[in-house]
UniProtKB/Swiss-Prot annotation:
Subunit architecture: Part of the 30S ribosomal subunit. Interacts with proteins S7 and S18. Binds to IF-3.
Role this protein plays: Located on the platform of the 30S subunit, it bridges several disparate RNA helices of the 16S rRNA. Forms part of the Shine-Dalgarno cleft in the 70S ribosome.
A Pfam family hit: Ribosomal_S11
Keywords from the named record: Ribonucleoprotein, Ribosomal protein, RNA-binding, rRNA-binding
InterPro entries xref list: Ribosomal_uS11 (IPR001971), Ribosomal_uS11_bac-type (IPR019981), Ribosomal_uS11_CS (IPR018102), Ribosomal_uS11_sf (IPR036967)
GO cellular component terms, A-Z: ribonucleoprotein complex; ribosome
Protein family: Belongs to the universal ribosomal protein uS11 family.
Organism domain of life: Bacteria
PROSITE patterns in UniProt: RIBOSOMAL_S11
Protein's UniProt name: Small ribosomal subunit protein uS11
Gene Ontology biological process terms in this record: translation
Gene: rpsK
Gene Ontology MF term list: rRNA binding; structural constituent of ribosome
Length: 128
């Protein structure tokens, strides 16, 4: 019989400083925690956290998504986070507050929302 290969346990790399990218659209909030080079350590979304439909685009859903991404990244030994916020959605501030409450020291908050220099025509105004 053939020998079964010896399986070694994969060692998790220890990262002290990281970056949190919060993409807050009007429909959903995506939180990705990366290392300094941009390699993703963990991520979570409001939709993947159990919220569907209009509840997905609430600040509470963004808070839950940020908590889930933060707890998943704690096994890498993260202490400090630099936060990059993109988008106009309702979960911008609550995601940053949730990361702060998860025990991370937030060193810097940067808004990286893309602003067009008169590029594409925006969608028409809603008539409700």
């Amino acid at each position: 019989m053939a020998k079964t290969p010896i399986r070694r346990k994969k060692v998790k790399k220890q990262v002290a400083d990281g970056m949190a990218h919060v993409h807050a659209s009007f429909n959903n909030t995506i939180v990705t925690i990366t290392d300094r080079q941009g390699n993703a350590l963990s991520w979570a979304t409001a939709g993947g956290s159990g919220f569907r439909g209009s509840r997905k685009s609430t600040p509470f859903a963004a808070q839950v998504a940020a908590e889930r991404a933060g707890t998943a990244a704690q096994e890498y030994g993260l202490k400090n986070l630099e936060v990059f916020i993109k988008g106009p959605g309702p979960g911008r501030e609550s995601a940053v507050r949730a990361l702060n409450a998860a025990g991370y020291r937030i060193t810097n908050i940067t808004d990286v929302t893309p602003i067009p220099h008169n590029g594409c025509r925006p969608p028409k105004k809603r008539r409700v």
